[in-house]
Amino acid sequence: MRKASIKRETKETQIELSLNLDGSGKYSIDTPVGFLNHMLETFSKHSLIDLEVLASGDVHVSHHHTVEDVGIVLGMAVKEALGDKKGIRRFGYAIVPMDEALSLCSIDISGRPLLFYDDLGLRGKITNFDFELMEEFFKGFTLYSGITVHLKALSGKNLHHIAESLTKSLAVALRQAIEIDPRRKDTPSTKGSL
């Protein structure tokens, strides 16, 4: 089984995260940021990655550190669980609607962490959650997972719907890319490694 458990503590956050890439989308999420919990549950459900997250942080200052650091730890765990990446499909893509919102995600598990992100330039709050923190979450995930991620909101007006559409599109694309291809016995690269 491709699993990982990461514990990361800083002066700003304390995070414990475990995942199973070969799961069924089971989750147990406990952070002090309600909307982040919702997005992590959505991510787990649609990627089929079993996910457990226990996090605390300096949310009296801002949600920023907790949201970004959970993204970082999730990226670290995905990278660790992928191991040598033998047999994976490597690429994944999805276009996912959430009511009026539509988002596209295309990923390459390349070992080259790059995020190309477009949220239509929208800003505002989802309850008490700053919408622009979605980019910080995705940036942390991308940099520490070693994955190239193109993530683009194509349309939408409701910030909750856009955030959820972005998260679901990443989850579905990642589900495809981490899947083991029974025909592939080696690492999916002409270089021989990723």
UniProtKB/Swiss-Prot annotation:
Query: What name does UniProt use for this protein?
Result: Imidazoleglycerol-phosphate dehydratase
Task: List the molecular function annotations (GO) for this entry.
Answer: imidazoleglycerol-phosphate dehydratase activity
What PANTHER family does this protein map onto? IMIDAZOLEGLYCEROL-PHOSPHATE DEHYDRATASE (PTHR23133:SF2), IMIDAZOLEGLYCEROL-PHOSPHATE DEHYDRATASE HIS7 (PTHR23133)
- What is any one of the record's Gene Ontology cellular component terms? cytoplasm
The record's disulfide annotation reads none
Q: What is its EC number?
A: 4.2.1.19
List the gene name.
Answer: hisB
Q: One matching Pfam family, short form?
A: IGPD
Q: Which organism is it from?
A: Persephonella marina (strain DSM 14350 / EX-H1)
